[in-house]
């Protein structure tokens, strides 16, 4: 596991989230928009959205239908717009306009699950965070870091046992980048993969050739 961590560090030194934001709540909303959508698409949509609604209070007072018009291309825009407005209202009314810093509080916000909460805890608050998105689940299973479970909570529990807390947040960001570049869902680029020597899936594929 340590060799995998160090190899990924060499490929992606920064290990940063690819969603663009300036304010804490903007990251929270961007993650909601990224569900069933690419980060690249979200980054194209959010500048106009945040220009129209420049404060958390303006989101809290917004008509979800108008928010939906700005995020239409992200897909599932009606539900996402409702969640964003409801989340903004709760942040303003119950948290003084601040994004809370605990798993319990974050998952109590509309549209926020453990994946989003972990990302916020890691990127905003600098806490150990295990963001189990589809890339992370797929790749850690292929590498044998986890048992191949597709259940996000099971994967998170296994990663907490095997990935050092101080490495966790950046490791998960690197999993996303590596999943886009090399270890894709279909037709992964096993030939020349820098993690091939530590990957049971790659070794099994090589034997079949």
Residue ranges and their predicted role:
Residues 1-208:
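Catalytic cores of DNA base-excision repair glycosylases
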């Amino acid at each position: 596991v340590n060799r995998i961590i160090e190899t990924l560090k060499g490929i992606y030194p920064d290990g940063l989230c690819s969603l663009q934001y300036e304010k804490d709540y903007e990251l929270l909303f961007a993650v909601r928009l990224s569900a069933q959508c690419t980060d690249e698409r979200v980054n194209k949509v959010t500048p106009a959205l945040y220009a129209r609604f420049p404060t958390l209070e303006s989101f809290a007072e917004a008509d979800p239908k108008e928010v939906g018009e700005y995020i239409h291309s992200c897909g599932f825009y009606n539900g996402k717009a409702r969640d964003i407005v409801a989340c903004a209202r709760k942040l303003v009314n119950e948290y003084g306009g601040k994004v809370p810093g605990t798993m319990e509080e974050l998952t109590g916000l509309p549209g926020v699950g453990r994946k989003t909460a972990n990302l916020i805890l890691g990127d905003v608050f600098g806490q150990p965070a295990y963001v189990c998105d589809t890339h992370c689940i797929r790749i850690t299973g292929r590498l044998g870091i986890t048992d191949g479970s597709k259940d996000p909570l099971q994967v998170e529990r296994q990663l907490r046992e095997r990935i050092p807390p101080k490495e966790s947040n950046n490791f998960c960001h690197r999993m996303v980048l590596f999943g886009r570049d090399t270890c894709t869902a279909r037709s992964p680029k096993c030939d020349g993969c820098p993690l091939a020597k530590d990957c049971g899936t790659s070794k099994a594929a090589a034997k079949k050739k």
